[in-house]
C-alpha cells in the first residue's frame, strides 16, 4: 500500500486555525530568522521577531540597524560596551525589562540606552530602579517680556546682567545679616543709652535692665541700613511675583516664603512702633509689645536662608535633607526611645543618693539627650555605680543610633552633588560643541516658546541639534555600506530582505 505525500502547504491548510489564504510560510521563516550581532568582538545571536518587538529602537528598526551591517561577515557590528549589551538584549527578550549589570557604571549604561534608542520610557524606568529622583520641570512665562525678567531674577547663570543682580542681592543679604548682628553689641547699645532725646528708652523687668530701642530713630544708622535692605528685598520680591508664570505656585515655593518672612518683620515692627501711644506706658502694655517685637525681630535671622537661592551648596543640602526625611524621622524616633529609657534608668539608679542631680525623670531628659549625642556638658552627672553604668550604655547606644542613618544621608548627598556637577559639565560641553546656527533651528525655536523647561530638556535640545549633523554622516555611511554590498555581492539577498 502506497501513501502519497501531500504538499506541506496543503497540510498546513488542513490544520485548524491555519487558513490557506492567511498563512505565509516565507513571512514565518523571516521572523524566525537568526541575526548575528557583534559587540566589539563578542557575538550574540537572536531572532528577528525578538528585535521586532520594539520597532522604534535602533535594533528593532531594519533601516536604522542597516547602517551597522557588515556584508562580508553577514553580521551587525557595534563598537560599544560589551557587558552592557547583555542587559540590552534581555530588554528585547523579556519584552521591556531593563536591568543594569553590576559591573557596568551608571553613566556608561545610560549612554548605551541612548545609543540603542530604547526610548524615554525605558530611561525613566531605569532611573527609577536606580533610585534617581526625577528633576521637576521649571515653568517659564509665556509672555516674552515676563520671561526675560523672570530669567533675569531667577536664573543668575542665564546672562551677564542676571549675574550682576545676583551679586547685588547676595551683598544686600550679607549687609543685612551683619547689621542685625552688630546692633546687639554693647558698644552700640551704650551709645543708644544716652539717646533719650531721640526716643530710645530702657525698661526694667525683674531687677534687670533691658536695653531696647523702643521707638525707632529715623536717623539711626542701623535703621537706615535696614530700610535700604528692605527696599531691595521688596523690589526683588514684587518683580518676581509679577513676572512669575504661576501666581498660585509662587507662594508654594519655599524660597518665596523665606522672602516674605524676611520682609514682614520690618513692616510689623515699624507699624507697631508708629501706632504706639504715649499713654500705653501707664497701662502696662509696653512689656507685651516689647516681647512681641523681640520675637518678630528674631525672625530677621532667617534672611540667611535667602543665600540658598544663589548657592548651589545650600540647595544640594536642602535637597539632601528633603530626600532624607524618612531617615531623619527614624533617627529622632530612636533618640526619643533612648531618652525615655535611659532617663528612667538613671533616675531609679540615683534615687537613693541624697545629692542626686536627677530629681525626676523629665529633669533627666536633658542628661540623656546630651549623653546620647556624645556632647557631655557635665552639668548633670551620675555618682553611683549603677548610674555610671547606665551613662556608659547611654553613650554607646547614642553612637550606634546616630551612626545608623548617616550612610543613607551621605549617599543622598553624593547623588545630588554628582548630579549637579555632571549637569553643569554636560551643559558646558554642549554649549562648546553645539553648532553656531542653533538660534535658527526650528526645534529650538519651538522649545523656546514652550511653557516649561528643565535642565534635561535643555540638554535634549542641544543633543537634537548635534544629532542633525550626525544624521547626515549616517546617511553617507548607509550609502557607503550599500555600495560596498553591491560591489562584493556577499549575501545581497539577505541584506535586501532585512531592509
From Swiss-Prot:
Cellular component GO terms held in the UniProt record: axon; axon initial segment; axon terminus; calyx of Held; dendrite; endoplasmic reticulum membrane; glutamatergic synapse; juxtaparanode region of axon
Activity control, per UniProt: Inhibited by 4-aminopyridine (4-AP) and charybdotoxin (CTX), but not by tetraethylammonium (TEA). Inhibited by dendrotoxin (DTX). Inhibited by tityustoxin-K alpha (TsTX-Kalpha), a toxin that is highly specific for KCNA2. Inhibited by maurotoxin. Inhibited by kappaM conotoxins kappaM-RIIIJ and kappaM-RIIIK; kappaM-RIIIJ has much higher affinity for channels containing KCNA2 than kappaM-RIIIK, with the exception of heterodimers formed by KCNA2 and KCNA7 where the opposite is true.
UniProt GO molecular function: delayed rectifier potassium channel activity; kinesin binding; outward rectifier potassium channel activity; potassium channel activity; voltage-gated monoatomic ion channel activity involved in regulation of postsynaptic membrane potential; voltage-gated monoatomic ion channel activity involved in regulation of presynaptic membrane potential; voltage-gated potassium channel activity
UniProt xrefs under SMART domains: BTB (SM00225)
Site (Important for normal, slow channel gating): 252
Lipidation (S-palmitoyl cysteine): 244
Extracellular topological segments: 183-221, 276-289, 348-361, 382-388
GO biological process: action potential; cerebral cortex development; corpus callosum development; neuronal action potential; optic nerve structural organization; potassium ion export across plasma membrane; potassium ion transmembrane transport; potassium ion transport
Region (S4-S5 linker): 312-325
Residues that bear Phosphoserine: 434, 440-441, 449, 468
Motif PDZ-binding mapped to chain: 497-499
Disease: Developmental and epileptic encephalopathy 32: A form of epileptic encephalopathy, a heterogeneous group of severe early-onset epilepsies characterized by refractory seizures, neurodevelopmental impairment, and poor prognosis. Development is normal prior to seizure onset, after which cognitive and motor delays become apparent. DEE32 inheritance is autosomal dominant. Nizon-Isidor syndrome: An autosomal dominant neurodevelopmental disorder characterized by intellectual disability, global developmental delay, speech impairment, and behavioral abnormalities including autism spectrum disorder and aggressive behavior. Other features include a thin corpus callosum, and mild facial dysmorphism. Disease onset is in infancy or early childhood.
Domain notes: The cytoplasmic N-terminus is important for tetramerization. Interactions between the different subunits modulate the gating characteristics. Besides, the cytoplasmic N-terminal domain mediates interaction with RHOA and thus is required for RHOA-mediated endocytosis.
Protein name (Swiss-Prot/TrEMBL): Potassium voltage-gated channel subfamily A member 2
